[in-house]
């Protein structure tokens, strides 16, 4: 049965995708200096389980996310794949980030997964997860030509690139595979567990709260 098609409205923050990418790069520069975003253990212990569904994504959404990012960055011998850099785990951390990201930012990631599924049913009359690999790749090629798909895909590729270039302590760039591929030597001092992103944000929020008392 063909699913009901919803209106695909791009959030205003993402209408100018180039500005969003510039703002995101500015945040990354600060994050690289400030410290790490998360603990490696979260990603290594949960990434497989998350693909079975979790508190934010259904099993279908998790599968769509994993499939799409691996189509964007495939294991084709031309550089690290999305799986190599644990892009799925990095995106899942972003979806759980309530300190820096707006609810609307994370909602846009998820709604894009739903739109991809709707587009699959519009073109192939079947859910995304039931498509063959060739059909999935063709579908991604088709929706990236659409306004919503071009915008959403640009955002997702930017996030995957973050997983490629950040310090491994952030959860992506597993075993420094991204740095090795880019022949990049990281700056020092490297981020540590004591000054990772959440801890810095928590301290800032506490100082702000104490100042309001």
What positions do the PLM features span?
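N-terminal export signals
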Residues: 10-15, 26-46, 132
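Short, amphipathic alpha-helical segments
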Residues: 22-32, 100, 110-112
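C-terminal segment of N-terminal export signals and the immediately downstream linker at the start
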Residues: 16-26, 41-79
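Generic hydrophobic alpha-helical segments
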Residues: 34-38, 75, 163
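Mature-region segments of soluble proteins
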Residues: 2-3, 78-80, 86-213
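N-terminal secretory signal peptides
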Residues: 1-22
């Amino acid at each position: 049965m063909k699913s009901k098609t919803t209106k695909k409205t791009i959030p205003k923050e993402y209408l100018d995708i180039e500005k969003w990418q510039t703002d995101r790069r500015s945040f990354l520069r600060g994050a690289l200096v400030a410290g790490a975003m998360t603990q490696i253990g979260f990603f290594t212990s949960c990434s497989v389980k998350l693909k079975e569904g979790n508190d934010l994504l259904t099993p279908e959404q998790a599968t769509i996310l994993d499939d799409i990012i691996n189509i964007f960055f495939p294991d084709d011998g031309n550089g690290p794949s999305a799986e190599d850099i644990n892009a799925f785990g990095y995106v899942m951390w972003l979806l759980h980030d309530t300190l820096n990201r707006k609810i609307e930012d994370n909602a846009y990631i998820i709604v894009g997964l739903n739109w991809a599924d709707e587009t699959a049913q519009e073109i192939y009359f079947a859910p995304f997860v039931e498509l063959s690999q060739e059909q999935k790749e063709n579908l991604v090629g088709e929706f990236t030509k659409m306004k919503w798909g071009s915008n959403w895909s640009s955002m997702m590729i930017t996030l995957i690139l973050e997983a490629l270039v950040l310090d491994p302590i952030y959860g992506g760039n597993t075993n420094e595979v991204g740095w090795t591929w880019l022949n990049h030597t990281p700056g020092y001092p490297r981020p540590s567990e004591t000054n990772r992103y959440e801890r810095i944000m928590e301290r800032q929020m506490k100082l702000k709260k104490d100042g309001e008392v």
